[in-house]
């Protein structure tokens, strides 16, 4: 059963192991069912897999922004982490 965004935010807050970032990053990247469950909540269809692979810390903060439905904050977080939003598409790009 898919979780709501709020439930996902809570789950990641309670299960975060920021001392072992690589292990946690791998967990998020491999948890496609959970990531896929987020997609219906994203008004513009942003891809969270790219964000999770880029930086797990920003992914966690992004989940919190999603729970608050703060679109400008989401854009700021993604921009700060080197991810740019292609308006009118369902994908993210990465700055190289």
Each model region followed by its residue ranges:
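Short glycine-rich, basic-tinged beta-strand/loop micro-motifs
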Residues: 47-66
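Long, contiguous N-terminal structural blocks used for assembly/anchoring
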Residues: 1-47
């Amino acid at each position: 059963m898919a979780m709501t965004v709020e439930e996902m935010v809570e789950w990641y807050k309670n299960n975060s192991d920021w001392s072992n970032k690589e292990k946690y990053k791998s967990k998020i990247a491999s948890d496609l069912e959970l990531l896929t469950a987020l997609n219906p909540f994203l008004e513009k269809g942003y891809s969270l897999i790219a964000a999770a692979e880029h930086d797990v810390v920003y992914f966690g903060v992004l989940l919190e922004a999603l729970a608050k439905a703060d679109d400008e904050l989401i854009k700021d977080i993604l921009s700060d982490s080197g991810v740019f939003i292609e308006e009118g598409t369902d994908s993210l790009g990465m700055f190289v």
